[in-house]
């Protein structure tokens, strides 16, 4: 359920035209209501900004491959990091080391695909894919 909470938080940010750019365990808080909340928007930016990133941003291991070059961060960048976070919550390691078996495997693989065009198109789409496998 935590990952779905984070999908909803990202969908809200993305609908406001904001990309987080630093999804990682340290930027997630579990509330007293046992919900996941996304923290630290210090390197967030507008999705529609014409400016390209001029330096690598994000956290090593969670940053999408495109964040290591000079490019524009976007929704797919956040979804990649959320896929890494999901994998880490399940296996304890980065998806490059191990990926869970079963139906979640496909979700992690799609979210962390190195080709942006193959990732989920939105956080809402990722939440829909996760919903059948999560107890809310």
Name each model feature, range by range.
Residues 119:
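Conserved HRD-motif arginine in the catalytic loop of eukaryotic-like protein kinases
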Residues 14-30:
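Catalytic-loop of the protein kinase fold
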Residues 2-3:
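Activation segment signature within eukaryotic-like protein kinase domains
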Residues 100-114:
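Conserved C-terminal C-lobe helix
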Residues 53-66:
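Conserved activation segment of eukaryotic-like protein kinases, specifically the C-terminal portion
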